[in-house]
Amino acid sequence: MTKEGVLELDSYRLLPYAVQVPCYVCEGGNAYDAELCRHCLAPMALGHQAANQKIQPRMVATIGPAAVGKTVYLGMLIDMLSRQSTGMQMLARGAFSIRLQQGVIGALRRCEFPQKTPNEPDRWNWVHCQVKSPEQRRPIELIMPDMAGEAILEEVDHAHSYPVIRMFLKKCAGLMILIDGEKVHDGTLDQDYFAMKLLTFLSELDDDPKTGWTKRPVALIFTKSDQCPELEENPAAFAQAHTPGLWQQTCERFHHHKFFATGVAGGTAFRQPRGQGRVRIPLRIEPHGVTAPFEWIVRSLGK
């Protein structure tokens, strides 16, 4: 004997997947509940937050070779601006935007430097923040990732190795390039070569005479300036004397640039863990010149 019945179909649950949600970085379509973009591995939270705001976020890149101090600089910058009660202030958007700040400050409190940024894009820390300045009537929204230096170099040498890097740099409104001032002072040429390759890559990435990289603000930041008093006195003169290739290329191709010197650790030492190589540790934290490059970038974007 066959009984009749009504079976409810659950196909309505598939309706949200019929509409693709674009990634804010590469604009590729993704499922509405995706955590990372399936094309470039950028957080989909960026796109969801941007869709609910009237002010569209702008992108600012902080890049440099491996071990230049990029993660420490970004974490300290965010921590300082988020705690200021006057002047330029920063407000994080989303819990994921606090992860970088928390990791860096936690490591420095333990008298350690944070671990090297992994090369895998799905493990990078992204920051979406609102920046308020007394000089500007309206706040601006910024997106800043902590990209691995080795991954950046790989994309420069081998195009499309990391699509997220190419797409992000193409859309960036401003750039902060970090250069190891201690290595430059010691005569190492790798820092000069890396910066020149990167600037050449950027000029070819978007060469539009009106909106390309020749018109965008570029801050060149020498890190670890506490190890070199000459650098702190005059960063531009230091660049001209010790990195002539970088100096010449910057002046010829990038009309809106400025050199800076910054440092976070007031002094460093080495310790020898058992069974491991020497590890550099900070003896004390004395940040100086950390906010100046970022403030210059923000003011340039507001013009």
Describe the residue ranges of each PLM region.
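Extended non-core architectural segments that shape protein topology and connectivity
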Residues: 2-4, 37, 41
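Switch II of P-loop NTPase G domains
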Residues: 121-173, 184-189
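Conserved G1/Walker A P-loop phosphate-binding module
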Residues: 16-25, 29, 33-35, 42-120, ...
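Conserved GTP-binding G-domain of TRAFAC-class P-loop NTPases and closely related GTPase folds
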Residues: 163-303
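A broadly conserved sequence feature marking short terminus-proximal activation segments
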Residues: 1-15, 129-140, 300-303
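Catalytic micro-motifs at enzyme active sites that drive phosphoryl/nucleotidyl and oxygen chemistry
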Residues: 47-49, 113-120, 128-134, 163-166, ...
